[in-house]
Amino acid sequence: MYPVPFVSDVRDNIRISEQAERLGYDSVWGNDHIATQSYVLEDFGQSPSYFSPLITLAAIAEHTTTLKLCTALLVLPFRQPGLLAKELATLDHLCGGRLRLGVGIGAYREEFESLFGSAAHGKQRGAMMDESLELLHRLFTQEEVTFRGKYFEVENLRSTPKPISNPFPFYIGGNSAAGMRRAARYGIGWLPSGFTVAEMKQKVEQLDILLQQEGRSLQ
């Protein structure tokens, strides 16, 4: 969860979410960081407390009944997809199908390298995300999965329970052409950022074409 000035305690997220639900808000969203970037240290002089979004959302789930619990964005290259599938399905059952997962490759290569050290050398986060999305999709829809990719492998993996939500609601982040292709193939939504209204109109038209290529539509 991204640190903000008015949240001094991780449990403040629960109290804010309870109040948001009482006020009629639809959803709460959590960001995902494993490590502190250099520019953050320069700006703040210390490392902020980045809490786990999935664990925080699980706590919020126990204190709410209607709020959708969402990430924007969970960084897929940080995680082994087989283990993540289990965590997501468990959380979706705990919250009664309210989980919505925004995913991305991560904004900062520096953070990826901090987590993986020398093992990060030569790894392509976009390709890792493609494999993760394919694996998660299969694990959520197939009884048994064998997958051999460049970065991830599973063998005769039966991942149960499946999430309550079917199809599982992936929201794909990223402004790039690759991000849009992922959204068209796997997403129920696309999470871009920084576009003007005119640019966004053009991007939606491009996304519609990509969806048609996948046999899908904006409707």
Regions found by a protein language model. Name each.
Residues 1-219:
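Active-site-adjacent structural elements that line small-molecule/cofactor binding pockets in enzymes
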